[in-house]
UniProtKB/Swiss-Prot annotation:
It holds the Pfam family PDCD2_C. Over-expression suppresses AP1, CREB, NFAT, and NF-kB transcriptional activation, and delays cell cycle progression at S phase. GO terms for cellular component: cytoplasm. It comes from the Eukaryota. InterPro entries: PDCD2-like_regulator, PDCD2_C. The modification N-acetylalanine is found at residue 2. This is Programmed cell death protein 2-like. Residues 125-150 are annotated as: Disordered. Keywords: Acetylation, Cell cycle. The gene is Pdcd2l.
Amino acid sequence: MAAVRKPVLLGLRDTAVKGCPKGPSAWTSSKLGGVPDALPAVTTPGPQCGRCAQPLTLVVQVYCPLDGSPFHRLLYVFACARPGCGNSQTRSWKVFRSQCLQVPEKETWNAQNQSDSLAAENWCEGSQDWGSDTEETPPPPASDLGSDSNDVRALDWTEKLQALRLQDTALAVTCPSPSGEGLTVPTAVPQFQPYYICVAEEEDYGSVVDLDHAHSLLQEYQRREGVDMEQLLSLGSSDGDEKYEKTTVSSGDPTFYRFMKRIAACQEQILRYSWSGEPLFLSCPTFEVSEVPACSGCGGQRTFEFQLMPALVSMLSSANLGLAVEFGTILVYTCKQSCWPPNQQMPMEEFCVLQEDPDEFLFK
């Protein structure tokens, strides 16, 4: 019996982050660029490049609490944006996971208002106040992302991920963390302009997409390589769960063809999220994918969680400071148990795999 494909959420770029957001409204948001936001009592990561030993730059921050878990949960992806480092495999890429226990909203309100005699209607008006000192609509209460139930539509992540975009400018600033919000690493690192991430369900694009552009790209690929991709694909078996078998062919790449065909529905996607699902490979998977190391914290198995997509590359360029990050796709694997020891104050390092873009010009 064919396995059921797990739902996929797509991350898309949206509005710019203004100023230095503080409090839960900052760390319950997902974004591209800027500086990492700290969870309460947990330090922000400050990784260094394994090649040049310089501080890494934040690429994305993803707020993704798991279904049924009592923890807030943040994932950070860092890369070296200096020339020659950003495409030097995973030595220049790092992934970290931070968590902290959620405090029920009602308990928080009661603790802060023990001596107050506010009317019930006032409590209702303020019950969604997350402590932001801006007038923006606060994000909804934390919910869950990634569970065995796969009830993706109910996930708060689809509402919290608000947008992502990078201009051809970069910053070299560090926003101070408000007292008590988290432990920060005061390092001035070149930063990409921060943007929020918004989310859509991949299946929503299936019936409305115009495939003309994708078809023209594939025709060009077939002409240049002198191959018939449909014929190549027929050489491999297909059991419905997208296992992406390795097919030995004289030329052409059926895995790349599948990748192009799948993303044609939403070419602007910069992130694909599918907890414990199947990654969308850009090229035939290497031993790194089949031999993902165990979690360094609990020794348990890691599982695929999300990947960064080629459309993100052009958003991470900077003409001013010469910063650039190049990749085809970045596959992120995290602890399947999402372990977090009591009183843990340091982020847990996770694992990522870099696949280079075999035909970079196709994504321009």
